[in-house]
Amino acid sequence: MTEPIISFKDFSFQYHSQATPTLQNINVDIYPGEKVLVVGASGSGKSTFANCINGLIPFKTKGNITGELYINNQDATVSCLHDRSNVVGTVLQDTDGQFIGLTAAEDMAFLLENNCVEQDDMKKNVSYWAEKVGMIEHLNHRPQDLSGGQKQRVSLGGILIHRTPILILDEPLANLDPATGHETLRLLNNIHEETKSTMIIVEHRLEESLDDTFDRVLLFKDGKIIANTTPSDLLKSSKLKEAGIREPLYCTALKYAEVDVESIDNLANLRDVCMSEHVKFKVKKWIDETSANNDNKYKSEPLLELNEVCVQYSDYSNSVLNNVQLNVYRREMLSIVGHNGAGKSTLAKAICGFLDITGNIQFCNRGFNQLSISERSEFVGYVMQNPNHMISEKMIYDEVALGLRARGMKESDIKIRVENVLKICGLYAFRNWPIAALSYGQKKRVTIASVLVLNPEIIILDEPTAGQDFYHYNEIMSFLIELNRQGKTIIMITHDMHLLSEYSSRTVVLSKGQVVADTTPVLILNDKKICEIASLRQTSLFEMAEYIGISEPQKLVQLFINHDRKVRRQ
């Protein structure tokens, strides 16, 4: 019988800074050549599990270990980090923590340089993998000139060059646009088939992840593995809901249409599911019997106006934003989407005053160009994509209170506002924790809280739900909806196609620094040409409509959104 390449036996791990173990009594074997998906809520122990395999725990991050862990038949606690890196390659969730080169090419070549590979061979290897991960045109770019998604692809290319027998990817889709994420999964599948490596993918985006095939899914909750099974069997169970993970949208739609999902053999394959005449009948019946009116209307009063706005990072580069014309209306929830590097984050930074622009920005008919960053922050709050770029304090409470203290507010008033926001963001229980002890997703919530507490009129959120489990996804979005009802204008930069459909009244699509579409989100996702230009990808609801033969997919999508809202209000 084949020996496992990874074996946990009664394994527990506790960080020195925490009172209880993050991993508790883990027993699991992973075999050579397997492809395993690891899912779980934010802070459930997924990344800690991965870091125990790659050696960051205990060789970099210290803590108390009980039980046994064997990697490639060797006791994992007695080897060194260098030796482990020859067996396990990891693409970290935090791309800035992995990017060490001055250019993309230099970063990808780091291992080859250390191994004294001839320069001609080095260039061939780097070019080959840069082409594979879609970064061939960006090899000479500096890390600060790359988007979060582009940095992640550079890291992926640098790891793939090494060809280790075990490959771990921690949230590989988190910073990628939907189409690129789909291509990444296909690339990883091809690599897995070619190399027969053992692949472990840690991911929140379950619907997108299941586009790929996995041998098993490990589901984490509170530091324990509560499911170790096939994707189809997991979707049939109630374990995802128990763990705070959103099931694929089509699974929820099937249940709303009163389809018995437990009777479906291959539930993880949407095309196979929709071949059933019974499924087709039930879904069409649900659509015919239910109204799908959409009462989302955005307001007609402009709050923020951008006229011919351009941004160019240097005299020798092309414009990142090119003559952008855009109105943001009072009290709307606007989503901005587009491919990696389209200019979405640059647009947000231009509005906030972080970048020099040409053109004109007005706020309530008042010139915005002349205002400083500090003055603009009275009107516009910005939550960056990468939480590490925002965090300044060591403790959670102090980080959220920082802006209020800078404005001279009384400490008693600060306490009330900070604690209220921490409760809404699911962080109150951690208010006295050091930020260093938080997961990436938890850090994201801290940065959202630090901006929400300042109460600006416009709130721009760059990937507000990235790295969040379904429970905190709903908590954050429900809070944003309530802010919107109170008169706040919300701008969301997102790769989550269902988020823009469900929560925004209007969607602006950027491609190569220009606005290429500006209409309702459902119409955007129903336009295959726009989706292709901007690297968007229709949700499984659109795919379900196509497979079943529904001529107007937007009806199914809007019906689902309306029905889902009613169910979650109950």
Curated annotation (Swiss-Prot):
Protein localization: Cell membrane
Cellular component, GO annotation: ATP-binding cassette (ABC) transporter complex
InterPro entries referenced in this protein's UniProt entry, alphabetically: AAA+_ATPase (IPR003593), ABC_Co_transporter (IPR022216), ABC_transporter-like_ATP-bd (IPR003439), ABC_transporter-like_CS (IPR017871), ABC_transpr_CbiO/EcfA_su (IPR015856), ECF_ABC_transporter_ATP-bd (IPR050095), P-loop_NTPase (IPR027417)
ABC transporter domain boundaries: 6-247, 304-537
Ligand binding (ATP 1): 40-47
Top-level division of the source organism's lineage: Bacteria
Amino acids binding ATP 2: 338-345
Keyword vocabulary terms for this entry: ATP-binding, Cell membrane, Membrane, Nucleotide-binding, Repeat, Translocase, Transport
Membrane topology: Peripheral membrane protein
EC identifiers of the protein: 7.-.-.-
Molecular function GO labels: ATP binding; ATP hydrolysis activity; ATPase-coupled transmembrane transporter activity
Family: Belongs to the ABC transporter superfamily.
Biological role: Probably part of an ABC transporter complex. Responsible for energy coupling to the transport system.
Protein name: Putative ABC transporter ATP-binding protein SA2476
Organism: Staphylococcus aureus (strain N315)
